[in-house]
Amino acid sequence: MEACPHIRYAFQNDKLLLQQASVGRLTLVNKTTILLRPMKTTTVDLGLYARPPEGHGLMLWGSTSRPVTSHVGIIDPGYTGELRLILQNQRRYNSTLRPSELKIHLAAFRYATPQMEEDKGPINHPQYPGDVGLDVSLPKDLALFPHQTVSVTLTVPPPSIPHHRPTIFGRSGLAMQGILVKPCRWRRGGVDVSLTNFSDQTVFLNKYRRFCQLVYLHKHHLTSFYSPHSDAGVLGPRSLFRWASCTFEEVPSLAMGDSGLSEALEGRQGRGFGSSGQ
């Protein structure tokens, strides 16, 4: 029987509780109150460092019953920095996450990257070599008013990869500005990418700007049937995300600055939030 691949991680944070690190998913829970101001981005420093197994990426997301939306982050293999969760307040007044009201999840997935000699329409090569997702640029100028949701239609079919499904995810750089992209499947007939501006300012995005990323998830990770190893909070109830079967191995030396030791990886290293540069 083939052994499960290992996700190496280090964790140290007095404000979060490591609730579970079972096969496939690591879960943290807040031990202290988190205040989210209206129309302001909130970042939660997790004190968590992680490296996916070969051929895998990592996905980071939050879940709560409170009126708070989490950015779903794609963690690239070359990212060596601390993981942080980006949260947006859905209301126009303060929201409070009391202890145990926020769960933070980290899980692995298998992916592939299409071979493209040149950019194809809005689909571009990633900024850093080895990144999980391809860059997707805006086909037109766009203005988003505060608390406005708009859709961007992309009609060009993405390159196909057998046994993999093209899926849209947001970028952490835009999420830090208050713009969240709703993850969704990119099908042959095109895709409508939904963007919501949670900030208090009108945000102008120029044509050709990178505004989301295209990730080819292995078809195993997309299911319409619920199981203990799936989550409806990532892609929605009609297409559940089922994480890869991996085990978690604690490696304290992964913590940047913990012992002065960090992995000398070329490329992304500590730039960005693990999903995209700012």
From Swiss-Prot:
Family note: Belongs to the dUTPase family.
Binding site for substrate: 76, 84, 171-173, 273-274
This protein's record includes keyword Metal-binding: yes
Cofactor requirement: Mg(2+)
Recorded name of the encoding gene: DUT
Keywords: Disulfide bond, Hydrolase, Magnesium, Metal-binding, Nucleotide metabolism
Disulfide-bonded cysteines: 4-246
Function: Involved in nucleotide metabolism: produces dUMP, the immediate precursor of thymidine nucleotides and decreases the intracellular concentration of dUTP to avoid uracil incorporation into viral DNA.
Catalytic activities: dUTP + H2O = dUMP + diphosphate + H(+)
Biological process, per Gene Ontology: dUTP metabolic process
InterPro entries reported in the protein's UniProt record: dUTPase-like, dUTPase-like_sf, dUTPase_trimeric, HSV_DUT
GO molecular function: dUTP diphosphatase activity; metal ion binding
Protein name (Swiss-Prot/TrEMBL): Deoxyuridine 5'-triphosphate nucleotidohydrolase
Subunit structure: Monomer.
Record-listed E.C. numbers: 3.6.1.23
